[in-house]
């Protein structure tokens, strides 16, 4: 489906609102866009009225008849608050919660499942003897295999989203792609549960079904992940700041960027509520065995088809628009040709502006894009450039592959599963998100203190640097105190270092995600054309795949006695990169947060 002529760039809250005011008065373009949407046959935008859930007294309903653009004086003096969030957006967040709960629940126990053999004296289902310091296990392929396969799984889970985004944007639409992904993921969970039956593990035949289930789980997640967050944000259809009088009599500016930020914080918090579900699976592997540890994720996964069936006729569904992808690649290709491949050339996109092309090629006919389309390409590429800084960041957020729970296996546990502390990552996020949403960010807006998107990402990077430094010091201490010295990983005795010393690494990593990852999702949606949002989100997710690829390169070094540098190397690299990132990109703290206008 092709939309009408591209709209003028809109802005969101912390962008220069004077430009947004000008855009607010271009009603004819917005009306033309609405007519183009209403004329699309088939699975198009749902116009049915929606219930709106309002969780904050400072959030208000976006009643169209009260829309008024703020004046310049109001921009300087009025408080900026988020708008109301449709109920469908919250329900989609719960859909994502169920998918992430099943995904993290299975993934959290996969490290021990792959690395360690069935414990001696255990129950034959993978659980160790009661009171033992032995970790749960099943396949016994060792640490290097476990880390490498974990990285391959992560790599596939974040590469396949590019295909999932293309399928959604160009062929079947986001919602139908989500349904296909859910079906494949369901098959994966069935195979995973069947392969963890004690008789299969005891016969040494658990590897093949586990590998098949991992691949299918990655495929299903790859179709689901890039499309769910854009679909959540599609439910919010107001992209222009406007003035609203609260019941108290106070006039405020309803800030679309603040609304979008709140939606993504809630979305990310529910992802991590789902991740907290792994607490049940790690205790299941330790106390009962892997058949239960994999059954629990499968049970919660059943919520997905039920909730999607309920939401089917209530959602705003954006139809596929292959024309947007085609136009993007045409503009980029012509830019490369016109600049002879010199991507560093100043004014790289000036030569493909419609006026410049018509002047250079007057007999070639009308140009099939507008200046707005060229600007969209520029802004999308800036977002993609920012995403290139995330792979090294991800290496520091929890370490390379499954190295953090492997480190915990060499520490004093006193009955605590070595992969239990991973649950403090989602716990920290669950606590931090409400604090940021309802206390910190409103206080900053009320005090007119700008905490821009680049500042938030930079803070997240620095928190990850500190997290990596802590893990480096913990690993050094393990080597110094282990009975086997610098061969602590394979030592039959653990180092007299409490596993709780890993807690700062998990907490700092979680705090960093609240700033870096959440802002990354915002940028992916807001800086991309409407017909490319899933694709740009998939490119943000692809940064995790690049991180996994870097981890695979480091895999040969993930052995004693080199583990200190496996932690310290990425930490140093991220510290240097963060300085470069801030210097190069801080100017984007104040630029337009441009997205489609549809009011």
UniProtKB/Swiss-Prot annotation:
<keyword id="KW-0325">Glycoprotein</keyword>
<feature type="transmembrane region" description="Helical">
    <location>
        <begin position="539"/>
        <end position="559"/>
    </location>
</feature>
<feature type="transmembrane region" description="Helical">
    <location>
        <begin position="178"/>
        <end position="198"/>
    </location>
</feature>
<feature type="transmembrane region" description="Helical">
    <location>
        <begin position="291"/>
        <end position="311"/>
    </location>
</feature>
<keyword id="KW-0813">Transport</keyword>
<protein>
    <recommendedName>
        <fullName>MFS-type transporter ucsM</fullName>
    </recommendedName>
</protein>
<feature type="transmembrane region" description="Helical">
    <location>
        <begin position="204"/>
        <end position="224"/>
    </location>
</feature>
<dbReference type="Pfam" id="PF00854">
    <property type="entry name" value="PTR2"/>
</dbReference>
<dbReference type="GO" id="GO:0022857">
    <property type="term" value="F:transmembrane transporter activity"/>
</dbReference>
<keyword id="KW-0472">Membrane</keyword>
<feature type="transmembrane region" description="Helical">
    <location>
        <begin position="563"/>
        <end position="583"/>
    </location>
</feature>
<feature type="region of interest" description="Disordered">
    <location>
        <begin position="23"/>
        <end position="42"/>
    </location>
</feature>
<dbReference type="GO" id="GO:0016020">
    <property type="term" value="C:membrane"/>
</dbReference>
<comment type="function">
    <text>MFS-type transporter; part of the gene cluster that mediates the biosynthesis of UCS1025A, a member of the pyrrolizidinone family that acts as a strong telomerase inhibitor and displays potent antibacterial and antitumor properties. These compounds share a hemiaminal-containing pyrrolizidinone core fused with a gamma-lactone, giving a furopyrrolizidine that is connected to a decalin fragment.</text>
</comment>
<feature type="glycosylation site" description="N-linked (GlcNAc...) asparagine">
    <location>
        <position position="517"/>
    </location>
</feature>
<keyword id="KW-1133">Transmembrane helix</keyword>
<dbReference type="InterPro" id="IPR000109">
    <property type="entry name" value="POT_fam"/>
</dbReference>
<feature type="transmembrane region" description="Helical">
    <location>
        <begin position="386"/>
        <end position="406"/>
    </location>
</feature>
<feature type="transmembrane region" description="Helical">
    <location>
        <begin position="454"/>
        <end position="474"/>
    </location>
</feature>
<feature type="transmembrane region" description="Helical">
    <location>
        <begin position="263"/>
        <end position="283"/>
    </location>
</feature>
<comment type="similarity">
    <text>Belongs to the major facilitator superfamily. Proton-dependent oligopeptide transporter (POT/PTR) (TC 2.A.17) family.</text>
</comment>
<feature type="compositionally biased region" description="Basic and acidic residues">
    <location>
        <begin position="23"/>
        <end position="34"/>
    </location>
</feature>
<feature type="transmembrane region" description="Helical">
    <location>
        <begin position="424"/>
        <end position="444"/>
    </location>
</feature>
<feature type="transmembrane region" description="Helical">
    <location>
        <begin position="147"/>
        <end position="167"/>
    </location>
</feature>
<keyword id="KW-0812">Transmembrane</keyword>
<dbReference type="InterPro" id="IPR036259">
    <property type="entry name" value="MFS_trans_sf"/>
</dbReference>
